[in-house]
């Protein structure tokens, strides 16, 4: 009888070892929050291989993996119904997640999204050649840059989605250019690959008395607009990804009133009139 009970106990123990990842629940695991509004279950105990089991559910797909650490970091993988493969990489400090979708071969990327703890993210989609065809960069404040129809030379269409309005333009290998037009005036906001912003204004008005010119101050991120040698207004492109406008007095010598945040595209156009 004792041998029988010992045999049953051994079988149950082996079954428990084989279950590993598939048997995680709230009793034998800890849930860890991750960037991107995800969470991962981490086993409280090590498995038979001396590692901690991990389970995460992404878009209703269960991903499984193991890790030497019990803090939730590691690599998890799964396979979709269409046989495409999904890989979730969680950084050691839990500050970043990388979600990748591959074709059936497990090598050709379909999409990739990197999300940080501050809620900023970069999402990319790839064409049949494995080249980036679409890209969305979301900042921590929720504003974002959207790129579509990206070609092999790095060119494409661009949008900057700000609070209340959208700027549209183009992408090149060197920079993003977002344009606002009003009458004869064209305002161009340039964003370099490193994220540095510069703004310029071009006016095709042939009359010197009404033609607008502008000077950009990179130190204060301010575009000062001048008409007939008099300053008329300042447009400030803030680090918080907002734009403010403030008027100069009639002599064009000093600012008056307070800077007002622009919340509509028409307000930018009015500032260019």
Swiss-Prot record:
Residue positions of covalent lipid attachment, annotated as S-diacylglycerol cysteine: 17
Keyword terms: Cell outer membrane, Lipoprotein, Membrane, Palmitate, Plasmid, Signal
Lipid moiety-binding region (N-palmitoyl cysteine): 17
Membrane-spanning segments: none
First-listed, main subcellular location of the protein, grouped into a coarse class: membrane
InterPro entries referenced in this protein's UniProt entry, alphabetically: OM_lipoprot_Borrelia, OM_lipoprot_dom_sf
Family note: Belongs to the OspA lipoprotein family.
Record's protein name: Outer surface protein A
């Amino acid at each position: 009888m004792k041998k029988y009970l010992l045999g049953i106990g051994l079988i149950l123990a082996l079954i428990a070892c084989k279950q590993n990842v598939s048997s995680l629940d709230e009793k034998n695991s800890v849930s860890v929050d991750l960037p991107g509004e995800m969470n991962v279950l981490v086993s409280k105990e090590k498995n038979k291989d001396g590692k901690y089991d991990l389970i995460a559910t992404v878009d209703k797909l269960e991903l499984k993996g193991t890790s030497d650490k019990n803090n939730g970091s590691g690599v998890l993988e799964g396979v979709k119904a269409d046989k495409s493969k999904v890989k979730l990489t969680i950084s050691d400090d839990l500050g970043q997640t990388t979600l990748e979708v591959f074709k059936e071969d497990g090598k050709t990327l379909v999409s990739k999204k990197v999300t940080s703890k501050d809620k900023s993210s970069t999402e990319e989609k790839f064409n049949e050649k494995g080249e980036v065809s679409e890209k969305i960069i979301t900042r921590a404040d929720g504003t974002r840059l959207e790129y579509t129809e990206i070609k092999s030379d790095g060119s494409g269409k661009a949008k900057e989605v700000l609070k209340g309005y959208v700027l549209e333009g183009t992408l090149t290998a060197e920079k993003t250019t977002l344009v606002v037009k009003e009458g004869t005036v064209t305002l161009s906001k340039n964003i370099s690959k490193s994220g540095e912003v510069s703004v310029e204004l071009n006016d095709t008005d042939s009359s010197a008395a009404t033609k607008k010119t502008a000077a950009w101050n990179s130190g204060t991120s301010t575009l000062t607009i001048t008409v007939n040698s008099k300053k008329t207004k300042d447009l400030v492109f803030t680090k918080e990804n907002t734009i403010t406008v403030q008027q100069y007095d009639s002599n064009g010598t000093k600012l008056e009133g307070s800077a007002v945040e622009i919340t509509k595209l028409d307000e930018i156009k009015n500032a260019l009139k």
